[in-house]
């Protein structure tokens, strides 16, 4: 467990390796998107198999998932992926983050991004891109406009503050 911010309002980042944290990881979007008529809930069994039981992907791709907690309640989540089949680019190996969901709090986003970056760097990644949920063949990118319409198939949904919170962490959008 990584304790990010000391004190009563502390943020803890916990690897989603047991039943409780995996359940929190899977159900967190329900909290983030409560009351959002444009959000379509994913199939939980599919999400669980994809993130925690995806044996073919795991044969060549290292994947880690974390949940951010504040005062015992889940407030964010993220994954990091490093695919050994992807050749390095001219400026080094690229790692990916994805499945990021969090409350509107800069400290939570900072803790999640830092955790993913540290994990990727420890495995040799020179840079990080995302969000990729979990590969380029799944949902990629970040919704930055038209938040009032449901996503198309294989497209993610986000709250309007995600773009700002990720930019605060030095992550710039590309088109």
Q: Would you name each region that the model predicts?
A:
Residues 37, 170-175:
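Proline-centered turn/helix-capping motifs that create local helix->coil transitions or kinks
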Residues 51-67, 76:
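A short helix-loop-beta-strand connector motif used in the catalytic cores of GNAT acetyltransferases and
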Residues 82-84:
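A short acidic/small-residue loop/turn micro-motif
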């Amino acid at each position: 467990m990584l304790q990010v911010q000391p004190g009563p309002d502390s943020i803890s980042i916990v690897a989603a390796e047991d039943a409780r944290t995996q359940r929190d990881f899977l159900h967190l979007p329900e909290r983030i998107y409560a009351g959002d008529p444009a959000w379509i809930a994913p199939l939980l069994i599919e999400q669980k198999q994809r993130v925690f039981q995806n044996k073919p992907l795991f044969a060549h791709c290292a994947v880690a998932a974390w949940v951010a907690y504040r005062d015992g309640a889940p407030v964010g989540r993220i994954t990091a992926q490093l695919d050994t089949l992807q050749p390095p680019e001219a400026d080094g190996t690229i790692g990916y983050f994805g499945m990021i969901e969090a409350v509107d709090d800069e400290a939570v986003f900072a803790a999640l991004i830092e955790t993913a970056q540290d994990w990727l760097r420890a495995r040799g990644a020179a840079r990080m891109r995302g969000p990729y949920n979990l590969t380029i063949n799944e949902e990629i990118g970040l919704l930055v406009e038209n938040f009032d319409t449901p996503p198309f198939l294989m497209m993610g949904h986000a709250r309007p503050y995600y773009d700002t919170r990720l930019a605060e962490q030095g992550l710039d959008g590309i088109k």
